[in-house]
Amino acid sequence: MLRIYNTITKSEEVFKTLNNEEVKIYVCGPTVYDETHIGHGRTYVSFDIIRRYLEHIGYSVKLVINFTDIDDKIINRALNLNVTPKKISEKYIEIFLNDMKTLNVKPADIYPKVTENIPEIISFIDKLIEKGFAYKTDSGVYFEIEKFKDYGKLSNINLENLISEDKLESKSEKKNRFDFALWKNKKSGEPYWKSPFGDGRPGWHIECSVMSMKYLGEQFDIHGGGRDLSFPHHENEIAQSSAYSGKNWVNYWVHTGFVMVNGEKMSKSLGNFVTISEISKKYSPEVLRLFFIQRHYKSPIDYTEESMEHAKASLQKLYNVIESVRIALENPVNSVWDENEAFFYNVLKNSKINFYRAMDSDFNSVNALKTVFEVSNSVTKYLSVSKSPNVALLIKTLDFFKNVGEIFGLFEGYFYKSSNVKEESLIKFLVDLRDDLRSKKNYETSDKIRDGLKELGYQIEDSSKENTVFKKINI
């Protein structure tokens, strides 16, 4: 039973979807004014693994990741380079999507842009004003946090303390220092859109509320992002979204930990970041994915050359083990079942159980990865003591690694390269081996191969007149 840590309740909860087998997820996307660094990469790889696991255990996932393509940072970058904000945003959207492809992050179902949803944003703000949660000033429209009594629940901030400690300058138009902008009236030289409250552009927080509701509905399952977005961004999103609909907007809040460099968060503002394109020149994307997987998604992770080299060596070890299993299958194999087979079978069976148990416990990749190396070490030992390994065990071992690869986004270079040619070659080898065993009337072993292939999704069709036929089936 899957359990997820919910930031808003500060507890691990049994995961229950709003709509049967479909999971709707919204992850805050990048403000596209610069290149993607590995701190961003960790967030999107983490949610990619969450998405992959949910799909693996039978859910249908609808994922939305937005692009903030109009913002102060984008405008300032455009002014400095004497180009339009659109030119800046389009450039870095393309870079982001290429970086995600490099990292083997599965594409979102929808990548909405702020500038393509302005009418919906204006309508949303208009309703908040109508319901008394927002007010107009000469500089724009603000959300009045005092009107939303649950403000601060996500980030554990006391609303009364915020209000009592507030000291506004007399010249401020806001009723409270923490009231946040829904709409910013235009300034000279900046892009703007016409609205009932004046020409201008959206504030940062409003965009995610509007786009998530547009594509996922007024209530959905999971909202995520980096831990730094918890306050004020996600707190403000909750306030305006719940005020708008009167409903509980999101069921589970999921936040990823920081990538740290010398004890500080990796960030553009500190200048201590490494871009995806830079690190990809030195390490394969799978090394970076394994580096992330070695820590729980909620925990901070220290980026060092040593940690990257460790991840590189660990990945190579796993590839070597998978290749050794494949080579063993190319040599004569049998159905012998003695204490060596029994011992390894129990390791494999228990490791598989513990892998899923770990992933069901808030996607605990750390404990899940331990089971992968348990299988790796055990099959290495098994192959070293067995002159003729058991074919069914070897098939199950490859199947285990393939499932791990599908969930973690690893082993692409082995299982999925060249349109699965390697897999089909292996299956054909096993089918031919089975034919040979049948011709020698070794039906016990040939039946085990048939059953093992069926578990992998291949159906055997025997014929007395021609070679055995195999075909892929849904399992």
From Swiss-Prot:
Predominant subcellular localization, coarse grouping: cytoplasm
Binding site for ATP: 268
Cofactor(s) essential for the protein: Zn(2+)
Cellular compartments per GO CC: cytoplasm
InterPro entries listed in its UniProt record: Cys-tRNA-ligase (IPR015803), Cys-tRNA-synt_Ia_DALR (IPR015273), Cys-tRNA/MSH_ligase (IPR024909), Rossmann-like_a/b/a_fold (IPR014729), tRNA-synt_1_cat_dom (IPR032678), tRNAsynth_Ia_anticodon-bd (IPR009080)
EC class (word): ligase
Reaction(s) this enzyme catalyzes, per UniProt: tRNA(Cys) + L-cysteine + ATP = L-cysteinyl-tRNA(Cys) + AMP + diphosphate
Entry keyword set: Aminoacyl-tRNA synthetase, ATP-binding, Cytoplasm, Ligase, Metal-binding, Nucleotide-binding, Protein biosynthesis, Zinc
Family per similarity comment: Belongs to the class-I aminoacyl-tRNA synthetase family.
The protein's name in its UniProt record: Cysteine--tRNA ligase
